[in-house]
Amino acid sequence: LKEIKSSTTEALRKFYERDGYKLLQSTATFENLKLLASFWNDVSNQNKERFSDKVLRRLFVLNYAPNSMWTYFTSVYFMHYKDEDGSLDDDRFYTFLCKTTAFVWAYALTNPGLNSLRTPIFAEMVNIIKGKDVAFADYKFDIQQFKNIFNNYKFFNGRPLTKSMITWWAYNSDDQELMSLETVIEIEHIYARNRFEKEHSLTSKEIVESLGNKAILEKRINIRASDYRFEDKKKYYNGYETPRGPKAGTKIRE
């Protein structure tokens, strides 16, 4: 409400101690905190009575964002647009999540680091409380420059954006079912990295580390399948029978 655009985050106590802790002692503040806590609890539990499948899928993808700034941004959106019962317009919320995903992913490429993202996000927070649609109008990307950055970016496994990108790609498929947020997923090299190091059967290691050779995969499967040839991996991807019963395959449709 104060339209603060500064990217320097004010200390929590300093913010609330103004006017003799008037804001902190307000009944409305406590009620708003309860509503916000309930919202995030339902996000965490993937409450299908509160959110549509398409919204829950976008929230799953954002859970693997390269940083946590989207959560603060979403909190501001919720507090401004919630109905009296704490609900949101589903289609409008879905559009907001899609725009947020696109911007956060792209900005992580062109301006890496959490601190740099604060400037456009804080400015857009002000637009939200003014009732304006999220558009990031003052932070448009140059298409050719962005393509150059994307094409030259090294998507190593240690970089958070790598898992962000392949999670987003997996959920671009309408056939991809919603997975639990408690599922531990890792990055799978479809052509195993260890096989390349042993056999040197590809022309370049860059091919092994390219996005096209990577997919998200549940940790329980990735541990078993990590060093196998693709023909052997399919057994673990699809699931198989053992004397003790069936071993489930991956839920990743890709």
Q: Can you describe what each PLM-predicted range is?
A:
Residues 1-164:
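A cross-family structural signal marking well-folded subdomains
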Residues 122-253:
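Betabetaalpha-Me/HNH-type nuclease active-site subdomain
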